[in-house]
């Protein structure tokens, strides 16, 4: 590999801001915020709005998002 053209791969902590769930993984993304992890080391902290802990597909709490009655208009249009 050519030197100095690839991003730095490091361990980071992702935190789901809606649930507070945190997980440690590898990423090329960095952050100025840091957090001390369970192992005593400090890692960059990346905040995300949705993760597998809060996403409706993974939690089983899916519901139909009807924006402005579009589903009703579709059903009415096609007599469903």
UniProtKB/Swiss-Prot annotation:
GO terms for molecular function: structural constituent of ribosome. It comes from the Bacteria. Gene3D superfamilies: Ribosomal protein L31. Signal peptide: none annotated. GO terms for biological process: translation. Keywords: Ribonucleoprotein, Ribosomal protein. Pfam families: Ribosomal_L31 (PF01197). GO terms for cellular component: ribonucleoprotein complex; ribosome. Belongs to the bacterial ribosomal protein bL31 family. Type B subfamily. Part of the 50S ribosomal subunit. NCBIfam families: L31, PRK01678.1. HAMAP family: Ribosomal_bL31_2. This is Large ribosomal subunit protein bL31B. It comes from Shouchella clausii (strain KSM-K16).
